[in-house]
């Protein structure tokens, strides 16, 4: 399914994209379940490798500078990078087949991992805010300014590359958890950017740059947190893009033999989309004919809605005057 509208351009749109990446909820092109799961695991592996290399470069800078504070910041960044491991485990578990106890499979583990990522972003915001206020009340002198600035630059580049990579693949495979983890990497990039800006401010003779930049970065992390929490919790509450429901209703209503669409319900299970629909068909049809209409409608639906892997269609004999029920169009 393509989108005809043009994305806005300019600095405001670019800033909005950083804090709230554009999303239509569904993915763009990867429709095979196994392929999308493999893409998610591959993304986690590559991003961990890049973050590990970033941390290694920062460790070299720490050794050359002898800065204890810089060493602590490097350890913090490395620990944050390891939060991708639960998501890796979630992707692996999500690929397991359904059982008699977990009849929908294990895809929901991915959404739980997304909740963990949101918790880590929340912790990052709290720590950043606390440190900024503490340095505002009790200013601390920044030593080894040049080395600190270099470490901040390396950290920002590495984390932002990982953020862009995870967010792009997350949109492509329909994984809210992977997008949230990309946003988490972006918050770490913000932290490194704060180090760089603070070092620059101190070098220019403005020591208060450190806590002020810290407060600004805290606000930026909170903006990212809002986006990540919204997307992950919508998945946990079975929220979907209303445009997908509209597309499904239109596709079903256009099928031969369908007199009305009673209802369409959708839910994400990890990065897989499931749908249930109720159709009204001609009451004169026999059971085999009604089944054929439902089967064809299911086939049409899986080709119309991106990332829809399973659909359950119920066909009912139409009653006189039946029509699509008015469920309202108010959406959040």
Curated annotation (Swiss-Prot):
PANTHER family: MITOCHONDRIAL METAL TRANSPORTER 1-RELATED. It is found in: Cell membrane. InterPro entries: Cation_efflux, Cation_efflux_CTD, Cation_efflux_CTD_sf, Cation_efflux_TMD_sf, CDF_Transporter. The keyword Transmembrane applies. The chain crosses the membrane at residues 46-66, 75-95, 113-133, 145-165, 202-222. It is a multi-pass membrane protein. One of its GO terms (molecular function) is ferrous iron transmembrane transporter activity. This is Probable cation efflux system protein Rv2025c. The keyword Cell membrane applies. The lineage of its organism: Bacteria, Bacillati, Actinomycetota, Actinomycetes, Mycobacteriales. Pfam families: Cation_efflux, ZT_dimer. Keywords: Cell membrane, Ion transport, Membrane, Transmembrane, Transmembrane helix, Transport. GO terms for cellular component: plasma membrane. Induction: Transcription is repressed by KmtR. Induced by nickel and cobalt. Belongs to the cation diffusion facilitator (CDF) transporter (TC 2.A.4) family.
């Amino acid at each position: 399914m393509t989108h005809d509208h043009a994305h806005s351009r300019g600095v405001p749109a670019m800033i909005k994209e950083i804090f709230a990446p554009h999303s239509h909820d569904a993915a763009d092109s990867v429709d095979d379940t196994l392929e999308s799961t493999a893409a998610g695991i591959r993304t986690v592996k590559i991003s961990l490798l890049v973050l590990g290399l970033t941390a290694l470069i920062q460790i070299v800078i720490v050794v050359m500078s002898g800065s204890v504070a810089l060493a602590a910041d490097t350890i913090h960044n490395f620990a944050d990078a390891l939060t991708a491991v639960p998501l890796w485990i979630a992707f692996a578990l999500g690929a397991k087949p359904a059982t008699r106890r977990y009849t929908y499979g294990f895809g929901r583990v991915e959404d739980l991992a997304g909740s963990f990522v949101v918790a880590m972003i929340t912790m990052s915001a709290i720590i950043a805010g606390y440190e900024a206020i503490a340095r505002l009340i009790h200013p601390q002198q920044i030593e080894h300014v040049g080395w600190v600035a270099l470490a901040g630059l390396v950290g920002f580049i590495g984390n932002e590359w990982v953020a862009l990579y995870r967010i792009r693949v997350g949109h492509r495979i329909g994984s809210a958890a992977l997008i949230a983890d990309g946003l988490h990497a972006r918050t770490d990039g913000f932290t490194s950017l704060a180090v760089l800006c603070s070092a620059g401010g101190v070098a220019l003779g403005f020591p208060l740059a450190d806590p002020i930049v810290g407060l600004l970065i805290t606000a930026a992390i909170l903006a990212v947190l809002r986006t990540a929490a919204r997307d992950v919790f919508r998945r946990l509450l079975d929220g979907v893009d209303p445009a997908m429901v509209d597309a499904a209703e239109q596709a079903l209503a256009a099928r031969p033999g369908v007199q009305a669409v009673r209802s369409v319900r959708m839910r994400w299970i990890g990065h897989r989309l499931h749908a249930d629909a109720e159709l009204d068909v001609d009451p004169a049809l026999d059971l085999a004919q009604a089944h054929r209409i439902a089967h064809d409608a299911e086939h049409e639906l899986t080709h119309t809605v991106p990332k829809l892997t399973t659909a359950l269609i119920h066909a009912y004999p139409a009653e006189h005057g039946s029509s699509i029920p008015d469920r309202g169009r108010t959406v959040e």
